[in-house]
């Protein structure tokens, strides 16, 4: 687990040297699990220079369409997966996406540039 922590810290630091870091409410929710107080999370976000963005309606619409494709591909979930909101937001905003879990993003959002730790694919 520490390997991923170090990778994440390193890539966020490197990427932020030349790019603005953005998260949306879905990522905010996922990250909040690691904090005891909202103030701690807000401080961390501020220190990292991360901007929190609303998910555009175009991305919400795309999320629904991708979810339908997922269901047609024998997906079993009853509502859109968090990664679908994240991938759709990256798609409509032309953002790069830093992630360790590339499978769903490659399948449903092939146009998004993924930044990931899989050295065999670099």
Q: Which residues does each PLM region occupy?
A:
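A secondary-structure boundary/capping signal
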Residues: 24-27, 101
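Short, well-structured N-terminal submotif of metal-dependent ribonuclease cores
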Residues: 1-23, 32-44, 115, 121-122
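A generic structural signal for alpha->beta connector loops
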Residues: 18-20, 49, 94, 111
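Active-site neighborhoods of divalent-metal-dependent phosphate/nucleic-acid chemistry enzymes
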Residues: 51-100
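A short acidic, often aromatic-flanked loop/helix-cap motif at beta-alpha or helix-coil junctions
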Residues: 29, 58-62, 120-122
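Residue-level signal for well-ordered alpha-helical positions
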Residues: 34, 66, 108-112
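Short, flexible loop segments at the rims of nucleotide/cofactor-binding pockets, characterized by
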Residues: 1-3, 30, 73-77
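Acidic, PIN/NYN-like endoribonuclease modules and their adjacent C-terminal/linker elements
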Residues: 87, 92-122
């Amino acid at each position: 687990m520490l390997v991923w922590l170090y990778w994440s810290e390193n890539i966020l630091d490197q990427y932020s040297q030349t790019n603005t870091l953005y998260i949306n409410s879905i990522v905010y929710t996922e990250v909040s699990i690691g904090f005891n107080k909202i103030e701690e999370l807000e401080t961390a976000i501020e220190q990292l220079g991360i901007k929190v963005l609303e998910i555009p309606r175009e991305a919400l619409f795309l999320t629904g369409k991708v979810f339908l494709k997922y269901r047609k591909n024998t997906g079993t979930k009853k509502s859109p997966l968090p990664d679908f909101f994240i991938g759709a937001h990256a798609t409509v905003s032309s953002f790069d996406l830093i992630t360790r879990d590339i499978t769903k993003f490659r399948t449903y959002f092939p146009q998004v540039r993924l930044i990931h730790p899989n050295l065999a694919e670099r």
